[in-house]
């Protein structure tokens, strides 16, 4: 048996995998879209940089997500990275809340694509979907970044062990002396119909 055949024969229990993944601390994002396919959005942590030449992000979405059809038809999205104080809006976008109620919880603006950009997000990446790859229940979306807006000054919002936590900002060089280091702190348990593992990929 080759190494590849041996690897393919190993079956990892899905529940054990989800429990292991819950221990990975991840940034929390709202993925939003608007256009011919309608307005939609979901909470995600399965977001990462692919390249800076050209600037490209990767976003994963479950094909069963209520936002999937709109994203597919619109072909654009905005990745809004959240900070402390965004726990409520993150939970709304991660559950079964109606679309209008989700967007009513924030103040929005438009960048280049027309996808809603959260006004007080730590940073918003306005993107055009340029490629996709199906893996299991999800699509991996490759997104060309066409505009960036950084406005928020809050501590970063993380999701780890099924709880929201915050990561204190590090002062930039030349700024005021740093306060003593603080450990990340928990700021709330996962809501009953909140993101769970779906937070990683909605």
Curated annotation (Swiss-Prot):
Pfam families: Flavin_Reduct. Residues 168-202 are annotated as: Disordered. It catalyses: FMNH2 + NAD(+) = FMN + NADH + 2 H(+). GO terms for biological process: nitrogen utilization; uracil catabolic process. It is an enzyme of class 1 (oxidoreductase). InterPro entries: Flavin_Rdtase-like_dom, NADH-dep_flavin_reductase, RutF, Split_barrel_FMN-bd. It comes from the Bacteria. Keywords: Flavoprotein, FMN, NAD, Oxidoreductase. Its EC number is 1.5.1.42. The keyword Flavoprotein applies. GO terms for molecular function: FMN binding; FMN reductase (NADH) activity; FMN reductase [NAD(P)H] activity; riboflavin reductase (NADPH) activity. Residues 171-196 have a biased composition (Low complexity). Belongs to the non-flavoprotein flavin reductase family. RutF subfamily. Catalyzes the reduction of FMN to FMNH2 which is used to reduce pyrimidine by RutA via the Rut pathway. This is FMN reductase (NADH) RutF 1. It comes from Methylorubrum extorquens (strain PA1).
